[in-house]
Amino acid sequence: MLPPGPLLVLPVGARVSRGGLSPTERSCISRHTQQYLRACYPSGRYGTKGLVVRWFTGGREPRGTDNEPSGNRSLEPHAWLTDVLTRLPEWPEERLAELLPLEGFTFFG
């Protein structure tokens, strides 16, 4: 099962209200993020320095539904990422799929 909603990469300090964003606000954040990445990484090689990655649901579902971000999920994002970053330098490339957070999860459509 994939996390709900699209993935937004936001500059550190950017806030997303609990009520969600309109499509116009979402595209504005997307444009702002692209400008931020171009300014910070003029070579075109993006890193993760100074960025926050958040899962965003539209805020249209009532609380307690299945689409609540990371509420009662068994995956702890910070612990998972710390574990993966610790293992990654010595991990064989042909076994990278084993490091994915959930079975069947893919990063590329």
Swiss-Prot record:
<dbReference type="Pfam" id="PF13817">
    <property type="entry name" value="DDE_Tnp_IS66_C"/>
</dbReference>
<dbReference type="InterPro" id="IPR039552">
    <property type="entry name" value="IS66_C"/>
</dbReference>
<protein>
    <recommendedName>
        <fullName>Uncharacterized protein YjgZ</fullName>
    </recommendedName>
</protein>
